[in-house]
């Protein structure tokens, strides 16, 4: 079976930026990939649609996925509140890596980040579970709206999302 592909249609201050397509590595991290896939489809009654990228740091990453508090303090997984680190097989090798944000070991929920550079210092701390396959131009546009402290200079929203 092939790995699932999902998408985000993203806007900044209500202006469409385009689509980001991501391949989820269910072959390596099936539980983590399934969590993200189901949050993209919203099939459990909650998910990423309408959620923001609340933290954007140029030359580092874009972070989103807090659909409960909308500020980086919330979110939840399809397995309950938090779930364990599945494995650290995949590494942060360059721009476009999709990885779980966390608050320490075994605290994965719904928050994720997309890297804009190689982030090898995060290997063994954050679970990489996919990669951007289309729309790196959209990722770069979002990155350009970031700031050194992470506060975006625009309201960046996932207007629609799902599985392809």
From Swiss-Prot:
It comes from the Eukaryota. One of its GO terms (molecular function) is cyclosporin A binding. CDD domains: cyclophilin_ABH_like. Its EC number is 5.2.1.8. It catalyses: [protein]-peptidylproline (omega=180) = [protein]-peptidylproline (omega=0). Disulfide bonds: none annotated. The keyword Cytoplasm applies. Keywords: Cytoplasm, Isomerase, Rotamase. PROSITE patterns: CSA_PPIASE_1, CSA_PPIASE_2. Belongs to the cyclophilin-type PPIase family. PPIase A subfamily. This is Peptidyl-prolyl cis-trans isomerase A1.
């Amino acid at each position: 079976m092939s790995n699932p592909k999902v998408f985000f249609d993203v806007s900044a201050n209500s202006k469409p930026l385009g689509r980001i397509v991501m391949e989820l590595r269910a072959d390596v991290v099936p539980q983590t990939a399934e969590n993200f896939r189901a949050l993209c489809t919203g099939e459990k009654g909650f998910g990423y649609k309408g959620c923001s990228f609340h933290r954007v740091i140029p030359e580092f990453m874009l972070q989103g996925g807090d659909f409960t508090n909308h500020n980086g303090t919330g979110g939840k997984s399809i397995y309950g509140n938090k779930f364990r680190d599945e494995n650290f097989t995949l590494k942060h090798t360059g721009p476009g890596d999709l990885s779980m944000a966390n608050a320490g070991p075994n605290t994965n929920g719904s928050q994720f980040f997309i890297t804009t550079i190689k982030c090898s210092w995060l290997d063994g701390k954050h679970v990489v579970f996919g990669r951007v396959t289309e729309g790196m131009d959209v990722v770069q546009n979002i990155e350009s709206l970031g700031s050194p402290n992470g506060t975006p200079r625009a309201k960046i929203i996932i207007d629609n999302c799902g599985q392809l």
